[in-house]
Amino acid sequence: MFEGFMVNTWIVASIVAVIAGLVGFFVVLRGSAFVAHAVPSGAFAGAAGATLVGTSTLLGLGVFSVLGAIGIGWLGRRGRHDVATALALAFMLALGALFLSMTGEYAPEIDSLLFGEVLGISTTELLPTLALAAACVMAIAVLYRPLMLSSVLSEVAAARGIDVARIEVGFLLVVALATTMTVPVVGALLIFSLMIGPPAAARSFTSRPA
């Protein structure tokens, strides 16, 4: 239970639980559950592309998570947000399929991104996870007040001079950071559940946003 790899597992699992709950609170509050599904699922294209060029899958995952978040934010300004999210997801999944077909070989590290590898976290992988978690917490702390207001009353936030569109993009980037740190641990399928399930259950006990 307290062997080296299990200690890493306990630490990383605890960090993932905190970050998923923190980011998921705003995901549920903003009604952006589809985004929490699209960014992790579509980011596997980055891992596939990284495998194709022979670089770190974590780097590829992070790049495509950020690009996907920016794409959703950019398209969302020009039309319905759910349609923009669906288009970004379809595009990233198509790229992922293309990259996988170009590799011409089985890539187990890509498949593991669907379900995660919580027992396979090494000490060297622990440090990037801690850094990304700290970045998520700092970003939420900086954006907290305008993000909270724009999530609850976007018209009031805009009337007070808050750039709602910029806050939206900033929050999408936070989701991208959370995706980059959590998907290798618990997988793209489970992180969606962790971001949505507990915050949605918590909201059923109170009508107050915070």
Explain the meaning of each model-derived region.
Residues 1-18:
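Membrane-interfacial amphipathic/re-entrant helices at transmembrane-helix boundaries
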Residues 4-8, 53-57, 77-81, 112, ...:
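Juxtamembrane/transmembrane-helix boundary motifs in multi-pass membrane proteins
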Residues 6-8, 78, 85-143, 170, ...:
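Transmembrane helix-bundle core of multi-pass membrane transporters
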Residues 12-16, 60-61, 124:
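Alpha-helical transmembrane segments of multi-pass integral membrane proteins
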Residues 13, 17-21, 47, 66-70, ...:
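Hydrophobic core segments of alpha-helical transmembrane domains in multi-pass membrane transport
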Residues 16, 125-198:
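Helix-loop-helix "hairpin" substructures at the membrane interface of multi-pass membrane proteins
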Residues 18, 22, 40-44, 66-67, ...:
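Hydrophobic alpha-helical segments embedded in the membrane of multi-pass proteins
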Residues 25-106, 202-210:
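Short loop segments and helix-boundary regions at transmembrane helix junctions
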